[in-house]
UniProtKB/Swiss-Prot annotation:
Chief location category: cytoplasm
Protein's job: Catalyzes the condensation of ATP and 5-phosphoribose 1-diphosphate to form N'-(5'-phosphoribosyl)-ATP (PR-ATP). Has a crucial role in the pathway because the rate of histidine biosynthesis seems to be controlled primarily by regulation of HisG enzymatic activity.
GO process annotations (BP): L-histidine biosynthetic process
Protein name (record): ATP phosphoribosyltransferase
Localisation per UniProt entry: Cytoplasm
Pathway annotation from the record: Amino-acid biosynthesis; L-histidine biosynthesis; L-histidine from 5-phospho-alpha-D-ribose 1-diphosphate: step 1/9
Subunit structure: Heteromultimer composed of HisG and HisZ subunits.
Natural source organism: Methylococcus capsulatus (strain ATCC 33009 / NCIMB 11132 / Bath)
GO MF annotation, one: ATP binding
The organism's place on the tree of life at top rank: Bacteria
Domains as described in the record: Lacks the C-terminal regulatory region which is replaced by HisZ.
Family to which the UniProt record says this protein belongs: Belongs to the ATP phosphoribosyltransferase family. Short subfamily.
Length: 213
């Protein structure tokens, strides 16, 4: 049995067609069920539905053999018990700094609000900026508006939410997409089925990319 960890929301919705092409179709609709462990039409695969930030933890500690997680989560996690064999090319967006329009990011000292504390600290340290990073769990756009922070670090897709709150994207930290991650021990113990699934997904991703070119 292979257990795949995935989060509800955009990643799950964009992963569903990809998994379906690999023959992995949930037998239960997670939007209509309270079940967190979902059987699939394949007897050898099940899905566990968890918070996005918890996917790498479940995989690293062996509660799931594989997972689908955004690069933003993986970079912030800083774990060592994972392989990251495949960029699935889904849930694309950008991790950026953002703040009031026309106000450049300070060159020496500033206060930053984000849930990506580790990533933000590394980014500003590389730029030689002394940053006080404040961890928030949501409503990042509010922080600069009420004087809590000079800027934020957050995911940006269309930028509509930023604009609606009087903010603008500033600096790109990294492009984000969702990745397949694998538990290192499971890779040894279940090498055959894991590499077969990863290879199948890789072929699907390559075919999609070829169609989009």
């Amino acid at each position: 049995m292979l257990t795949i960890a995935v989060s509800k929301g955009r990643i799950y919705q964009e992963a569903l067609p990809l998994l379906a092409e690999a023959g992995i179709v949930p037998s239960v609709d997670p939007d209509k069920s309270r079940k967190l462990i979902l059987p699939t039409e394949r007897d050898d695969v099940q899905l566990v539905i968890i918070r996005a930030a918890d996917v790498p933890t479940y995989v690293e500690y062996g509660a799931a053999d594989l997972g689908i997680a955004g690069k933003d989560v993986l970079v912030e996690y800083e774990g060592e018990g994972l392989y990251e064999p495949l960029d699935l090319g889904i849930a694309r967006c950008r991790l950026m700094t953002a703040g009031p329009p026309g106000r450049p990011v300070a060159s020496r000292r500033l206060r930053v609000a984000t849930k990506y504390v580790n990533t933000a600290k590394r980014f500003f340290a590389r730029r030689g900026v002394q940053a006080e990073v404040i961890k928030l769990y949501g409503s990042m756009e509010l922080a600069p508006l009420v004087g809590l922070a000079d800027c934020i670090v957050d995911l940006v897709d269309t930028g509509n939410t930023l604009r609606a709150n009087g903010l603008a994207p500033q600096e790109l930290i990294m492009d984000i997409s969702s990745r397949l991650v694998v538990n290192k021990a499971a890779m040894k113990m279940k090498y055959g089925p894991i590499t077969e699934l990863a290879g199948h997904l890789a072929r699907i991703v390559s075919a999609r990319a070829a169609r989009e070119r």
